[in-house]
Amino acid sequence: MSDKPPYRKILLIKLGALGDILRSLPAMHAVHHHAPDAQIDLLTREPFIGFCRTIPWLNHVNPATTYRPWQISKWLDFARDMRSRNYDLVIDMQCKPRTIFYHLLFGLGTAWSGDSIFCQYKRPRRTKPVRQHPNELLRQQWKNLGIPFDVPADLDWLSEAPPINPLPARYVVLVC
């Protein structure tokens, strides 16, 4: 991508747990900082929709599907819906088999960054050491897209973000 990205509609895919979403906030901010006028949407799991809607760099948050493999008509409806949104670029931040399958559903005509063999912008594979930090992989993926990852993200909005709903009656918070 050049200094002025040609992408007007960008979809980020992040289906992991809450910690994965929090850890990827700097990457989401980098996309917004690089393309401030673009519509940036997120595809994520249902439990995190409410929280993700408070992320100031996102325009829309869409729920990811959890259909069974044999529910072909539902998968096709999902694919039709996502294709109708006409994204210029999809950035697969998850790079798991499920999101690689999404690439086939969305159609190969959309610019895609991720791990699918058909990607225009391949995400680097894990190198030695194998336990490479996920943010380092995102940093390399963003470099391939021409998106600077060195702008600090303002996270003050987190102090006012609503809790993840519904919280179970009993839960544990681990802070490292």
Put a short name on every predicted segment.
Residues M1-C176:
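Catalytic machinery of carbohydrate-active enzymes
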